[in-house]
A protein has these predicted regions:
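PRPP-associated nucleotide enzymes
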Residues: 1-123
Length: 123
């Protein structure tokens, strides 16, 4: 939903041709094969923004980055809605919605309403 909202805004404010792509990562086994909803040819030599809801340990984002580095890209950026700064990996978000100082034991949950509004909860 987050990527769809960003794509809709980009369509509204620019003349960029935006192609949305879902990335499928097994969070319990991130070394397993990562797949996308579009072919590699569709994003080869194109600018790409990899978007995640919460950047916590960095595991999901870094394995996603690894997947897209297998093809040449024109430009590569990352974006997250919530940045928690508890990274296990040397990964950063180029674009952040909000940075939260939380303890490692706390949990951030992002939910999207039917009105396409995002709400983040600290649990």
């Amino acid at each position: 939903l987050l990527t769809q909202q960003i794509g809709a805004i980009l369509d509204e404010i620019s003349n960029l041709k935006v192609t949305m792509c879902n990335v499928f990562i097994d969070k319990k086994n991130p070394l397993a094969s990562i797949t996308t909803s579009i072919s590699k040819k569709a994003y080869t030599n194109k600018p790409l923004i990899l978007i995640d809801d919460v950047l916590n340990s960095g595991t999901t984002l870094i394995y996603g980055v690894k997947h897209f580095l297998e093809v040449p890209l024109k430009r590569f950026k990352t974006a997250v809605l919530v940045n928690r700064n508890h990274k296990k990996y040397p990964i950063k978000a180029d674009f952040k919605g909000i940075s939260l100082s939380t303890s490692i034991k706390e949990h951030v949950q992002v939910e999207f309403s039917k009105k396409n509004e995002a709400v983040a909860y600290l649990i």
